């Protein structure tokens, strides 16, 4: 099963085999948030950024507070067959996100399409960055490339200084 938020976000907030535990983090208690003065100065008083968890579309390069757009408003969406299109409000930073999630006719596969449009009128350099926040203590398996690239790498992993990938 898959659960997607439309009252905020959007986020894929739950992804699991029916009757099994959610593989994604769902921050129900809103423990992970940013309501710093710097964020409020930029986005407005009363604005708070919540991680919410799950899978979301972000932009790179990351910068503070610009990247931490409080996406706490309802999302425009349409459903057609096994496909949902989600369009949140344009951000103060001039980004218009569009996400399309397509469910396979059979099995548990979900195709994700992400798009960021620059609606600011300014020239902006960025890249779409899809983040998936997994639940602590779980095991995730990611398909690995089998491409024969000779002496060149065929897979890449990126970790931030605060990432902990230990099995402890």
Regions found by a protein language model. Name each.
Residues 1-111, 115, 119-168:
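Surface-exposed acidic/polar loop and edge beta-strand patches at domain peripheries
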